[in-house]
UniProtKB/Swiss-Prot annotation:
The lineage of its organism: Eukaryota, Metazoa, Chordata, Craniata, Vertebrata. GO terms for biological process: proteasome-mediated ubiquitin-dependent protein catabolic process; protein homooligomerization. Induction: Up-regulated in peripheral blood lymphocytes stimulated through the T-cell receptor. One of its GO terms (cellular component) is Cul3-RING ubiquitin ligase complex. Its interaction with CUL3 suggests that it may act as a substrate adapter in some E3 ligase complex. Does not affect the function of Kv channel Kv2.1/KCNB1, Kv1.2/KCNA2, Kv4.2/KCND2 and Kv3.4/KCNC4. GO terms for molecular function: cullin family protein binding; identical protein binding; protein-containing complex binding. Residues 44-146 form the BTB domain. It is found in: Cytoplasm, Cytosol; Cytoplasm; Nucleus. Disulfide bonds: none annotated. Residues 220-234 have a biased composition (Basic and acidic residues). It comes from the Eukaryota. Homopentamer. Interacts (via C-terminus) with GRASP55/GORASP2. Interacts with CUL3 and with ubiquitinated proteins. Interacts with CRY1. This is BTB/POZ domain-containing protein KCTD5.
């Protein structure tokens, strides 16, 4: 019975069999070469170490934009200064939190940003990786967001203050902290024993209502509290 012998080959530097502890026979070498070309083989996958977080994706995904940093990384561009860690992953010193939306865009062509992430952060990463279509998409999203914010109608809070004629000038002159005079309504006069009749007025004032992270309006200042106290006299 004939015996099967393997004719050993010296492992080529950087080629198939390198790092396996010895040479490979011609038959085994051909088999591994075919495996490397088979769809789904390890060679199509790329491991990235972005700011200490690992990402695993395909070369096809990273090569969506031929002008991008990631495309050049996959092509082993000699002009691109890139290192690998001990696991063989490409080292990229960027924020891994914002790399997720960038990678997902390359995977399916849609921009999906979690509500706790800022569009400006994604734009920074898109510009770093030089993904032209994503840069345009994020800029459009930022413009749309800013446009909606500017179209929100301004809300006002109104107060009606009651004062006598002698108090009117002082009250109007001391109004500040965003309060504005709106309308003055005469309500007749009041009679105090031993004094002359004094005209009384209702003074309507308003202030823009600004939203804050912890409520709908800021804490009133001392001058605003004075206006509120005068209004409570009604």
């Amino acid at each position: 019975m004939a015996e099967n012998h393997c004719e050993l080959l010296s492992p080529a530097r950087g080629g198939i069999g390198a790092g396996l502890g010895g040479g490979l026979c011609r038959r085994c070498s051909a088999g591994l070469g075919a495996l490397a070309q088979r769809p789904g083989s390890v060679s199509k996958w790329v491991r990235l170490n972005v700011g200490g977080t690992y990402f695993l994706t395909t070369r096809q995904t990273l090569c969506r934009d031929p002008k991008s940093f990631l495309y050049r990384l996959c092509q082993a561009d000699p002009d691109l200064d890139s290192d690998k860690d001990e696991t063989g992953a490409y080292l990229i010193d960027r924020d891994p939190t914002y790399f997720g939306p960038v990678l997902n865009y390359l995977r399916h062509g849609k921009l999906v940003i979690n509500k706790d992430l800022a569009e400006e952060g994604v734009l920074e990463e898109a510009e770093f990786y030089n993904i032209t279509s994503l840069i345009k998409l994020v800029k459009d999203k930022i413009r749309e967001r800013d446009s909606k914010t500017s179209q929100v109608p301004v809300k006002h809070v109104y107060r009606v203050l009651q004062c006598q004629e002698e108090e009117l000038t002082q009250m109007v002159s001391t109004m500040s902290d965003g309060w504005k005079f709106e309308q003055l309504v005469s309500i007749g006069s009041s009679y105090n024993y031993g004094n002359e009749d004094q005209a009384e007025f209702l003074c309507v004032v308003s202030k823009e209502l600004h939203n804050t992270p912890y409520g709908t309006a800021s804490e009133p200042s001392e001058k605003a509290k004075i206006l509120q106290e005068r209004g409570s006299r009604m």
